Amino acid sequence: MRGRRFFYSRFLVSKDINLWDMKRYWLFKSDVEDYPLSQFIKDKKTAWEGVRNYQARNFMMKDMQVGDEGIFYHSNAQPSAAVATLEVSALATPDKLQFEKKSDYYDEKATQEKPRWYCVNVCYLQSLKVPISLEAIRSEKDLQSMQLLQKGNRLSILPLTEKEYKKLLKLGGL
């Protein structure tokens, strides 16, 4: 008898696979002016706050686990580029900025009892030896299906396949 199947992000997975035991990989985008790599290195660990897209929020709430790894990517930089690696260090908790009236990320519909926005903690692992520009990513045949390259994709957090993650590490000199 055939097992039921379901879609997890972009991946077809059998019901017999325990997704919680699988390490996942992510691309975390940050505007270079909002949170530069130099600040991430100094902080060593940060709450990934300010995500205001439901799909990206759901990745953090439902899919990310402690130990998942990712690429820190500077958007709106000259050039935009993958610059470091990181690791998810704590599960999703309510994003405190949604409750702060003076914050750019304040959400008047969010309450302590029913928060709308969540964030995970991530810790800095290491800088790539060679930043990987968006142009370099586009030119790699093995990375053509990356969600980062899909037209209209503006999410601040994107899933990566293990193959994409390892290719980015290689391109970055790690």
Task: Report residues per predicted region.
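Short, charged beta-turn/beta-strand-edge "cap" motif at the junction between a beta-strand
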Residues: 73-79
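Short hydrophobic targeting helices and cationic amphipathic motifs
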Residues: 7-12, 19
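Compositionally biased, charged N-terminal/linker segments
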Residues: 18-66, 164-165, 173-174
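Aromatic- and Lys/Arg-enriched surface recognition patch
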Residues: 84-151, 155
